[in-house]
Amino acid sequence: MGSFSMWHWLIVLVIVLLLFGRGKIPELMGDVAKGIKSFKKGMTDDDAPDTAKTVDHKADETK
């Protein structure tokens, strides 16, 4: 009662194909892939340390 048989998955696949059509599924998967790629890029950009230049000013020691 709790598990799905092969026929259940086949029926679900047919319904999904009817709802979205053949051309829409690759577009959706492409959009998901682009989102994952940009997320990974954002995560690696955040890991890069901020290298700020520091300038040490020394007072002129004239006596």
From Swiss-Prot:
Q: Does the keyword Transport apply?
A: yes
Q: How does it sit in the membrane?
A: Single-pass membrane protein
Q: Where is the composition biased (Basic and acidic residues)?
A: 53-63
Segments spanning the bilayer are: 1-21
Region named Disordered: 42-63
The reply to whether Metal-binding figures as a keyword in the UniProt entry is no
Give the keywords, sorted: Cell inner membrane, Cell membrane, Membrane, Protein transport, Translocation, Transmembrane, Transmembrane helix, Transport
Highest rank taxon of the organism: Bacteria
Molecular-function GO term, any one: protein transmembrane transporter activity
UniProt cross-references to InterPro entries, sorted A to Z:
TatA/B/E, TatA/E
Which cellular component terms (GO) are annotated to the entry? Answer: TAT protein transport complex
Instruction: State where it is primarily located.
Output: membrane
Location(s) in or outside the cell: Cell inner membrane
Q: What are its GO biological-process terms?
A: protein transport by the Tat complex
Subunit structure comment from the entry: The Tat system comprises two distinct complexes: a TatABC complex, containing multiple copies of TatA, TatB and TatC subunits, and a separate TatA complex, containing only TatA subunits. Substrates initially bind to the TatABC complex, which probably triggers association of the separate TatA complex to form the active translocon.
PANTHER family hit by this protein? SEC-INDEPENDENT PROTEIN TRANSLOCASE PROTEIN TATA
Q: What job does the chain carry out? A: Part of the twin-arginine translocation (Tat) system that transports large folded proteins containing a characteristic twin-arginine motif in their signal peptide across membranes. TatA could form the protein-conducting channel of the Tat system.
Task: Report the sequence similarity comment from the record.
Answer: Belongs to the TatA/E family.
Q: What is this protein called?
A: Sec-independent protein translocase protein TatA
Source species = Rhizobium etli (strain CIAT 652)
